[in-house]
Amino acid sequence: MINTQTLARPYAKAAFEFASAAGQTDSWSKMLNLAAVAVEVPEVAALLNDPRLTSESKVQALVRVLGDDADEAFRNYVQTLGENDRLSVLPTVWELYEDIKAQAEKTLEAEVETAFELSNAQLQTLAAALSKRLDRTVNLQQVVNPALIGGVLIRAGDVVVDGSVRGKLSQLAESLKS
């Protein structure tokens, strides 16, 4: 079976190229998110997977669900997805679209896990250091996890920096085992 990312990638790229050219990347992000959420609703998913319905009727049903939140260009995009039997990959299209958008805007969502809550000044300092290291604007989301004991664990895209006491203790335990 073909990977959904393989199916969704060209649609995500096309959506981003169109939205970028029209200066509507944020509104397309919202519309794609809405459509992605809609196709995951069990009732809508059942309707879209019903083999008795034509692709046109499936598209019309999804467009009705989206209502006025989808502009004409987006409805045409949904029509294209429907004609190619790709409505079910909308959640993956949205995820890939967001990745492409973040790359184009040179932004990166990062999670910083700490044992204790950091102050705004500490978060800003950390975000600035990460932005410099990764050459991107970093948006930090803080998660407090007392199990870390101390230090920080940072996840930014493919980069993971484990500066936690728990991580250091795990490394020490591994080195003692060998």
UniProtKB/Swiss-Prot annotation:
Q: Name one GO molecular function term.
A: proton-transporting ATP synthase activity, rotational mechanism
Task: Tell me yes or no: is Cytoplasm among this UniProt entry's keywords.
Answer: no
Does Cell inner membrane count among this protein's keywords?
yes
The primary location reported for this protein is membrane
Keywords associated with the record? ATP synthesis, Cell inner membrane, Cell membrane, CF(1), Hydrogen ion transport, Ion transport, Membrane, Transport
Q: Where found, per UniProt?
A: Cell inner membrane
Q: Which regions span the lipid bilayer?
A: none
Q: Which GO terms describe its cellular component?
A: plasma membrane; proton-transporting ATP synthase complex
Query: What is the membrane topology noted in the UniProt record heading this document?
Result: Peripheral membrane protein
Pfam families per record: OSCP
Q: Which family does it belong to?
A: Belongs to the ATPase delta chain family.
What function does this protein fulfil? F(1)F(0) ATP synthase produces ATP from ADP in the presence of a proton or sodium gradient. F-type ATPases consist of two structural domains, F(1) containing the extramembraneous catalytic core and F(0) containing the membrane proton channel, linked together by a central stalk and a peripheral stalk. During catalysis, ATP synthesis in the catalytic domain of F(1) is coupled via a rotary mechanism of the central stalk subunits to proton translocation. This protein is part of the stalk that links CF(0) to CF(1). It either transmits conformational changes from CF(0) to CF(1) or is implicated in proton conduction.
Its quaternary structure?
F-type ATPases have 2 components, F(1) - the catalytic core - and F(0) - the membrane proton channel. F(1) has five subunits: alpha(3), beta(3), gamma(1), delta(1), epsilon(1). F(0) has three main subunits: a(1), b(2) and c(10-14). The alpha and beta chains form an alternating ring which encloses part of the gamma chain. F(1) is attached to F(0) by a central stalk formed by the gamma and epsilon chains, while a peripheral stalk is formed by the delta and b chains.
HAMAP family per record? ATP_synth_delta_bact
**Name the UniProt record assigns to this protein:** ATP synthase subunit delta
Which gene produces this protein?
atpH
